[in-house]
Structure formats: C-alpha cells, structure tokens
Amino acid sequence: WYLENLTDEASRKIWEFFQGIEKEGGIVKALKAGSIQKKVNATAAKRYELADQRRQSIVGVNQYVNLAEKKLEAPEGSCCSAHKGHGCCKNADIQLPEVEMSVDSACKAAGEGFSTCLINKALVAGVDCKCGEPLEMEALPKRRLAERFESLLAKADAWVEEKGSRPMVFFANMGPLRQHKARADFSRDFLRAGGLDVVYPSGFQTPEDAARAAAESGCAVCVICSTDDTYPEIVPAFCKALRETRPDMMVALAGYPADYVEAFKEAGVDIFIHVKANCYNTVEAIQNKIGL
C-alpha cells in the first residue's frame, strides 16, 4: 500500500508541475522566463544543504570514506575521456549536419552512431524557433551532489601527492575507551569526508598530558573527545595548557554541550564537531587551518 500511496503522491506533484508549465505557455516560454531554472536551483540548493550536513548520505564521499581507495582512471574511448578529445562513438570525428528539431531525427542520428554531444550541438545550431529569432535562456549548470565534498577530497589528495603523507588531525581522547570512543569514532568518520586522517591515541588521564601530546604531535588541529559531563573539568584545563606551548593550534570539541558552548569558546575552543554540524563548512575550515 505504501508504494502505491507514494506513487500516487509523486504523480500528482508531477502533474501539478506540468500544469504550471502549460499555464506559462509551454516549456519554451517557461525556460525563457526562468521559472523552471528557479525551481531546479532551489531543489539543488536544498539537496546540497542536506548533503553538507550529512543528512543525505553519499557513501564513500560524505559518509564511510575509504582513504585507502585508489582513484579510478577513465578507460580510453569512454564518454568521460571524450571530454579530453577522444572519441566516444564511431562517428565522433565526423561533423554532423544540422538536425531537425524532432525526436525522429535525433533518434535516427543516434542509431547511426553519433554521440549525444554532437547531436545536441547540431540541434542547437538548427534552432530558430521558426520565427527567425534565436532562443536565449538561462542555462542550467552541470552539477553533481557529491562535487563539493569531492573538491575537499581532491585537495587532500593533492597534499598527499606533494607531501607524501595524508594531512593529520590529533585526537585528545580522554579517559577509558568507553568515555571517548563513541565521539572519537564519529569525529574520525566526519573528518574523512575531507580526506583527513587522525592520530588516535589511547585515552589520556589528565588534560595536561593530552595537551602536551597534542602540542608535540606536529598537527595543526586537535579534537577533544570525551563526554558532556566531563567536559567542564577537561576543556578549560586542556586549552590553558595547550595555549602555553601551541597558541596557534586549532581546538575542536567533539559534541555540542549547549549549556557550555560560550564558556568553552572563551576557554579556547574554535569549532565543534557534532551530528547537526555543517560537515562541509567545518571540514573546509579545518583544511584551511592545516594549509590545504
């Protein structure tokens, strides 16, 4: 039943959308007016927001990133390699004449082996709207949901290629495993969305010991990992000890204890890693601090 209900709901929304286009005078007028572009851009912005907050998962990109994964190369002759000047079909090097604006003519060209990019180029060249005036409208950009996070990963990969090692973040894990593991594991996965790896030590007994290890790690950023009820005792002492030797080090806190956020900022916490945080913005800020 639920599938039928969702299908009915989707079909009604789609039909409403088509009726809106017809009210504007058809697809061409709607595109020229920019109403379709506006709706598409609004949807894209919302989806980017969900992905940035990891409320929409992109496995391997903003969730469950495998830093050891090797980048695939596009095989010769694929559509991806066509952008580099290689053929993606048997007639890629042939100049296709103007194609009439009809489904039949486009299908015929495709059946003869012409690529979609050549067919599109020929269609555009032949468009005159039957009135002698060229069509002018706002173009919809090519975009993918994963591209923002892929840009972060690309910067980290470039760092690895230049430095020979992955950019690292130090984890100030406090107390026994049960005290820090949940937030440390979450923060590690969070940071991997930007291609960052972590120094993951056993739990420290005192904030001073953790601050000393963080300062000596050589990392530009550290993350305090513990529980909300222990943070009031740990955070001020850790920040004070760290500032004595590494005042330039960025301090992140795993979690967001609302009652203490302002106090912890005053103590020296720069950024918070938590489930409601904007992952893209947070990781980008950490990358910038590291120097990517």
What are these regions (language model features)?
Residues 1-292:
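Domain-level signal for soluble alpha/beta catalytic cores
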